[in-house]
Amino acid sequence: MSKKLYIKTWGCQMNEYDSQKMAELLDSTHGFSLVEEAEQADVILLNTCSIREKAQEKVFHQLGRWKNLKDKKPDLLIGVGGCVASQEGDSIRKRAPFVDMIFGPQTLHRLPEMLNQLQHSKSPIIDVSFPEIEKFDRLPEPKADGASAFVSIMEGCSKYCTFCVVPYTRGEEVSRPLDDVLYEIAQLAEQGVREVNLLGQNVNAYRGETHDGSICRFADLVRLVATIDGIDRIRYTTSHPVEFTDDIIEAYTDVPELVNHLHLPVQSGCDRILTQMKRGHTALEYKSQIRKLKKVRPELSMSSDFIIGFPGETDEDFTATMDLIKAVDFDLSFSFIYSARPGTPAADLPDDISDQTKKDRLKLLQEQITHQALRIARQMLNTEQRVLVEGPSRKNPMELRGKTENNRTVNFVAPHSVIGQFVDIKITDVVANSLRGELVREEKEMGLRIAHSPADILANNHHMATPSNLDELGVGTFTP
């Protein structure tokens, strides 16, 4: 009888990726299968996030509920991972001594050894070190789950924004070697993945080492990923404006696989606040890069993160943020009321804005974004949109759902045989949080671009260009 594993995940897409890797790892080493309820599990893992307010207390509240399970089932093992574990490992050990394993984002690959150790000793294990890229060398081969997949290309962040805990919980920027990234994507493409989302806390800062010791920058990585047959869409998150350089904008001119959607967090539209946040750019510089990008991709949609009520934010400062939102025409935002993160420089600043003022500003910002999003959605009426079919509609299993390039969900009627493929859909209606449409053509009628098969790349020892096959831009393609 297989052992049962339950994983609860909070936070960003990187955490979702890490949780998937934990499940795959423990399946390959110990035969664990995932279950939907903690009550069914032999091992429970909590993958935590420290971004939101009161993240630590949320963890202890959850652990308190699971303590009751362990009281009834003494052999149950409980582990806490993620950014809160990295930041508050000693506190978790003291306040929740029943927790068996505490591990950081960079040590999740050591879970099998932790479980083996717990078979011989019941002493709690804590490992929140930063062994850089080691975890990727120890993870099992990827398993595709649908037509879209996340691939982590780097870890950590070296920007040290004053409000952010990431450099302290995930470490400084470390890029995966180029060959490793391309190999993982080729494996996923062999399993039917059509869209890849490149992940990193500061993904545009990717500087991956090649087989000959040189460095591959993010724009060149994108071009190489685009040559893999089957990968017809490329997304990436999260970006930093300082690293969103002109060579990346240039890639949008000749890499059609890059989608017409960009998530580029700006946090504030006020230069004074941006300086206090240590963001390294001005609102004008941000708008300038977006203006350049929209010259080559006029249909591109934009989303961003915003922090509301950062210490010292005045009404005029907030108005500058609203002006930026209108100027860029964002159609989606992840907006949060500021709350101090322990250990960050901003935590020492006086939190001098009332909760009600923060709530009022957040409401105004979200209303403006919603207004813009609805207008942009209505502009899509009667247009044809290429949609990657994800599966049955969540509301009507007789229909299918998929995602447009600009990240909108579309529901439509089509044969289930097109799941995992691209279809062209005419948009006929705009409803709350989604679109409706009619099937125009299936993928077999499209003639999508083919460059190199995943099998070619998997068979190649280096997966890297040689000087003889560089194009006029100095960008290479694979030699099968």
From Swiss-Prot:
Its cofactor is [4Fe-4S] cluster. Residues 143-375 form the Radical SAM core domain. It is found in: Cytoplasm. Residues 3-120 form the MTTase N-terminal domain. GO terms for molecular function: 4 iron, 4 sulfur cluster binding; metal ion binding; N6-isopentenyladenosine methylthiotransferase activity. SMART domains: Elp3. Disulfide bonds: none annotated. Its EC number is 2.8.4.3. [4Fe-4S] cluster 2 binds at residues 157, 161, 164. Binds 2 [4Fe-4S] clusters. One cluster is coordinated with 3 cysteines and an exchangeable S-adenosyl-L-methionine. It holds the Pfam family Radical_SAM. It is an enzyme of class 2 (transferase). Belongs to the methylthiotransferase family. MiaB subfamily. Monomer. This is tRNA-2-methylthio-N(6)-dimethylallyladenosine synthase.
